[in-house]
């Protein structure tokens, strides 16, 4: 009959390797988190720059497009035509307001 011999050295060796592997994972997890944060910041920055460029492009396009002639005011045909056919539009232009400080 053969008897099995205990493998005490092998158990210690595998436990030691597991500890080294876990240490490596713990140490590299901080680097992985830092890399993910850096990538997120880079993506956010690229999206922000693209949005600013798009906004600038659209603003210049709106400012440079030719303005059409002003629509003529409809003449009142009868007493019941008080602008009910065409809704009134209100255009608001923001103006710099300067408040005096005392």
UniProtKB/Swiss-Prot annotation:
Protein name listed in UniProt: Noncompact myelin-associated protein
Residue ranges of the TM segments: 31-51
Subcellular localization: Cell membrane
GO CC terms: paranode region of axon; plasma membrane; Schmidt-Lanterman incisure
Alphabetical keyword list: Cell membrane, Glycoprotein, Membrane, Transmembrane, Transmembrane helix
GO biological process, one term: peripheral nervous system myelin formation
Organism annotation: Homo sapiens
Role noted for this protein: Plays a role in myelin formation.
Post-translational modification: Glycosylated.
Feature: compositional bias, Polar residues: 78-92
Membrane topology: Single-pass type I membrane protein
Extracellular side: 1-30
Cytoplasmic side: 52-102
Region (Disordered): 60-102
GO molecular function (one): structural constituent of myelin sheath
Superkingdom per UniProt: Eukaryota
